[in-house]
Each structure stands twice: as structure tokens, then as C-alpha cells.
Amino acid sequence: MNKTITFGIPCYNSADYMDHCVESILEGTGYADDVQVVIVDDGSAKDDTPQKADEWQRRYPDLVKAVHQENGGHGLAVMKAVANADGAYFKNIDSDDWVDADAVRALVTTLRGFLESGQQVDMVVSNYVYEHVEDDSQNYVNFRRVLPCGKVFGWNEMGHFKMTQYLLMHAITYRTEVLRAANLQMPAHTFYVDNIYAYVPFPLVKTLYYLDADVYRYFIGRDDQSVNEKVLTSRIDHYWRVARIMMRAYHVYDDIESPQLRSYMMNYFTIIMAICSVFSRMSERPDAMDQLDSLWADLKAYDPRMYRRAKHGVVGLATNLPGPVGKWITLSGYRVARRVVKFN
């Protein structure tokens, strides 16, 4: 049976919550034989994640594939799932997250329609929901006023994204061939590589479809979660690493043909640089500001126009104000935005 979609689930010591993730996919899709789940055990050694992965494959050998690798980090686990995917489409679901049953059925039905009609769609965008455990609230992210709904379209047909709207990994289902053609070079043992995943392949995407359904449920609230403010601050060097990879992927103004895609990618990269600026200021590392200065210097040398846009645009100016007062204003602005948008 040809597989319509592969859901990749990277797992690292995920025994406490991975079953919910797998169940949400299998139950949501009705255990359909054209749906595949690839569970990647990323060298888990502190719990029974490897055994759970193998048990899922034993129970559903035609639907679930368990893959084991030495610990390499989230990015390598995602790409291991891509390498083992049999589906025409691929979607990553982190092991502490889950999918909505009705929405994931709609996604699979939509993908089947493309394959049956022979219509080549490179990327499907769907909505996602931040599930905040601390106050049992939800923050819904959709693209209704940005992307045409219910039709195949190209980058030039999309509108202007708000600061709260970005095509993150949670929103994306790639055609597997496109994702493999991107040849993503994910750094080992590095967090926040989902930004690379949701950036580097985009110029290879020629056709898109927006499914207005809340497919992905993104859990927020674990103390060790990578988007937790304290954790992110302690791992700011990971963001520096990711920013450099994104920087060197393209000379955005020269390499990206579509004006709309060029604008989107430059805005997204600017946000990544802003995150580096904000959390470098929050970091207790004695070299944090020197490292940030080095990052900005690298960008200026690589592409002066990208540097000017990222550093001297509104977002760049607001997140790089000089002196103690500038730092206070920057961090105060971040915390206000965090309360309003609730992105971590």
C-alpha cells in the first residue's frame, strides 16, 4: 500500500507522553493503511522510550516503523524520520504534542485528493494551537487573512503576515520529495532547528494549499521545554548557531525570486536575529554580548543589505537599543509581547 503521509515523531526520553502523540495520529486517521508513523528513538537511555517505540511497531507493523539512533538531537531525529518515510507527504509531530482528530482526518483526505487527481502540491499549511498547561488556555494561530483558502496557489498570492503569524514547523506538511531535495543540514545536539526546517526548503516550494483546520496541538508548560524562557536563555548559543545557518542559506534579496516569499523570509530571519538579541541580553553568560556582536558582524560581512534590514528596521532597532536603559526597554517589550501573544 502506498502511503499518503508519514508522520515523524522524534523521541528522546519521551516515555511519559509519546503514547498520546502516537494514539492521536492513529485514532485520528482511523488507523488508515495509507498513513505511516515513524517513531525515531534518539538514543533514549533514561526511560523505556525504545521499548515503547518497538511495541508500537509490533502492534501495528503496517502503520508504525520504529527507528533507533545514537543521540544526535532533535534535528537529526527529524531528518532520520524523513529518510525512513514512505509517505508522499511528511509532517513532523514532536512527542509531547498531538493532533486534533477531525483536523488530521481533513488533512489526510485533502492529501489523498491531490494524489488521486495528480495535482502536485509542494506544501500544505494548516493551523496550530498553543496549549498552555499553566492556565489551561489555548492560543489559536490561523492564516485566514494571509493565505487563499481551498485552492492551490503560489507564493505571490499570499498576503502580509502579522507578527503573530509565521509558518512554523507545526503548520507545515511538505511533499516528501521537496523536503529531501532541500538537503537540510541539521546541526547535531542543537535546539531550535525547527526554524531551519521552516525556512531553507521554502524556495523549492512552488505550489501551496491552505487547509483551515487546527491540526497541530502544541503543548507548552514543561519546565525542561526548549521554549521555556529560562531554558532558552541558557541555550542562547543554540540560537546563534541556527541564525548563522539560516543566514548562510541564502542571500535573500538576490536568491529569492518571488517578492512575497522574499519579504516573508527576510521578516522571519529578522525575528530570529531579534530573538538572539533579546535572549543574549537576558543571558548570564559573560561572553553573550560579545557573541551577539560577532553574529551581527558576520551578517554584515555576508550580506550588507540583509544586515541593514535586520538590524536597522523597526524590529532590529527595538531589540538592539544601546545601554542599560535600552536593555530595560527591550526586555520590557519582550515580556509584554509574551503576555499578549503567549508564545512560550
Q: What residues fall within each predicted segment?
A:
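Glycine-rich, basic loop-to-helix element that forms the pyrophosphate-binding segment
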Residues: 69-85
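Catalytic core of nucleotide-sugar-dependent glycosyltransferases
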Residues: 213-222, 228-257, 275, 281-304
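Short, well-formed alpha-helical segments that are part of the catalytic scaffolds
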Residues: 14-28
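Cell-envelope/extracellular polymer assembly enzymes that use nucleotide-activated donors
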Residues: 4-6, 36, 196
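Membrane-interface aromatic/basic loop that binds lipid-linked glycans or pyrophosphate carriers
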Residues: 282-344
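Donor-binding/catalytic cores of nucleotide-activated saccharide
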Residues: 74, 98-208, 218-232
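A conserved acidic beta->alpha catalytic loop
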Residues: 41-51
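Short aromatic/hydrophobic "clamp" motif used to bind/position activated sugar donors
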Residues: 90
